[in-house]
Amino acid sequence: ALGKAWCTGSSYAVFGAAQTEKLTTEHRYITDLSDLDMLRKSKYDQSRIGTAYADCKRLLSEGRKVVFTGTPCQISGLRAFLGDKEYPELLTIDVICEGVPSPKYKNSFIKYMEEKHASSVKTLDYRDKDGGRWDYNVMSLTFENGKHITIDRWVNPFFDIWMQHIMSRPSCYECRYTTSRRCSDITLGDLWGVHIFCPELYNDNHGSSVMIPSTEKGRTAIELAKQQMTTRELDMDTVVKYANRMRDPIAMNERREEFLSDLDKMEFKRIKRKWMRLSLIHI
């Protein structure tokens, strides 16, 4: 909705994280809103910026309206790249970030699933709403042999081990952007606690997001987008209460080095047996 509200006319671009055919994640841009699906959905993966900053600057110099989405550190990087010049046509949007899993860990998980199901993974959906509720983080995988499986978050080794905060980059544990003072025009994230203070928005399974404007430009964009959304206003204290990463960075697991050492030498099956906190006999 924000992209559609900002990108009026015929000269615009929207940047975001896209999943590649190799199941990696990289920043790409679209110039047709009908292609927005490529940038939608969650990707719990490190997105490669590539030439996105340079492309953004070039498109702005051409007079295009641009929406650039990313993690807070990626938005900060874009602003540093662009320098002190103000770009009225640029709308920046960051997401509340929990850090990302190690690429080696993700690849090990995919290899394990491919061996288990005797086929290459064709698509990986980290949060499949068709397979379960938006807040259950149901993962779905489609294989080249046509097989399709879903794994509930609460019995998913991928999520359980990652969420132990045991594999993120060192900088994530000292993240300077885990505060209510953001570097973008708008901050987006899951509206955790929605069942408590907005129960009428909880049961449709579409998910509820929090939108926090940090600039006048951000407030203007949200007002324009409201026509396409069902909205409720909340005070900032309520939002921050349930959004941990707007208060503090993730805490480094004291066994991080041990885990990374295991990741270097163990297959995922052994990683799962040692580090999983739940019983996953059937996964």
Locations of regions flagged by a protein language model:
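Iron-sulfur-associated redox domains of electron-transfer enzymes in respiratory
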Residues: 1-281
